[in-house]
Structures are given as C-alpha cells and as structure tokens.
C-alpha cells in the first residue's frame, strides 16, 4: 500500500468548501461531509502537534526539539524523586529506630526501678533491709 502526497491546494479546497450551500447534496450528505471536514481539521492539528514534538531541532534550527527536552526533564525528575524517596525512607527508619530506642530505655528503666523496689524491703519496725542486710545488724 503506498501513500501519495497531495498538493496543499487540494487540502485547502477540502477544508474551505462549504457543503451546506451545495444544492446537489442531500441534508444527510451535507452533514456527513461537514463531519469529515471537521475530522480532517482535527487530524491536521494533531499531525502538526506531533510534528512539533518529534522534531529533533527547535524552530530556529538549533538545540533540541520539545520531545527531547521533555524526556530529559523527566529523567532528571525521576532521578530526583529516587533521591527524595531514599532520604524519606531513611528519615522514617531513623524516627522508628529512635522510638524503639526510647521505648526500650523506658522499659529498662521501669525494670530497674522495680528491681530496686524489690531489693529495698521495710520490716515491721520501719527499718529498711538492703539485699538481706538489715539496719539493726550494723
């Protein structure tokens, strides 16, 4: 299948023809041709936009086209997002680790306090016994 290119004059006649004024066409044919005309205009716009995006140079013949700029910018953004994600993950890990450390210290502190309270027992006379040694024995 081969495609042939038409002159711009052929395209402009298709675009500018007013099918509503043509007496040889039925109203349905007029509407169908107007819809084809509208679709043709939209396809031309899409084609022009795609051509701008896929150009390897800008309008002045220098530098890179907009699609290449977009791809490069997206790559840079992706790299930055990876760094941000890594730093965020590290910060969250650090916070969780600090919370675990604090909870562990509190647990150890409570255990030591309980051990001290268990080791210091008072007898009936109010004397404090330290690890089995009473104050009276001194």
UniProtKB/Swiss-Prot annotation:
Keywords: Cell cycle, Cell division, Centromere, Chromosome, Chromosome partition, Coiled coil, Cytoplasm, Cytoskeleton, Kinetochore, Microtubule, Mitosis, Nucleus
Disulphide linkage map: none
Annotated compartments: Nucleus; Cytoplasm, Cytoskeleton, Spindle; Chromosome, Centromere, Kinetochore
GO CC list: cytoplasm; DASH complex; microtubule; mitotic spindle
Coiled coil: 30-59
Superkingdom per UniProt: Eukaryota
Location of region: Disordered: 1-20, 106-138
Principal localisation: nucleus
Pfam families: DASH_Dad3
Subunit structure: Component of the DASH complex consisting of ASK1, DAD1, DAD2, DAD3, DAD4, DAM1, DUO1, HSK3, SPC19 and SPC34, with a stoichiometry of one copy of each subunit per complex. Multiple DASH complexes oligomerize to form a ring that encircles spindle microtubules and organizes the rod-like NDC80 complexes of the outer kinetochore. DASH complex oligomerization strengthens microtubule attachments. On cytoplasmic microtubules, DASH complexes appear to form patches instead of rings.
PANTHER family for the chain: DASH COMPLEX SUBUNIT DAD3 (PTHR28017:SF1)
Protein name: DASH complex subunit DAD3
Native species: Candida albicans (strain SC5314 / ATCC MYA-2876)
The encoding gene: DAD3
